[in-house]
Amino acid sequence: MHTKHYIEGYRYLIYIYLIGKRLLRLLRLLHSLKINKLRRNNLVLIRCCRLLRLRTVKIFPFISGAKKHEQRH
């Protein structure tokens, strides 16, 4: 009886271990996908910011001049 219980227990442990491994792989994949998505989003945001900056520079040249002066210090 005891050996049977032990075998069952080990079997469960092995199942849990294998499932855990698979879950970790999935999580890693998801994480990498999320990072890639975030990077893409950041690139899009940066592009938008650049466009906005260019527009603001055209509209408000005095603000950009002040910013440049601050950056020098």
Curated annotation (Swiss-Prot):
Question: Looking at the record's lineage, which domain of life comes first?
Answer: Viruses
Protein's name according to its UniProt entry: Putative protein p4
> What's the source species for this entry?
Acyrthosiphon pisum secondary endosymbiont phage 1
Q: Which gene encodes it?
A: 4
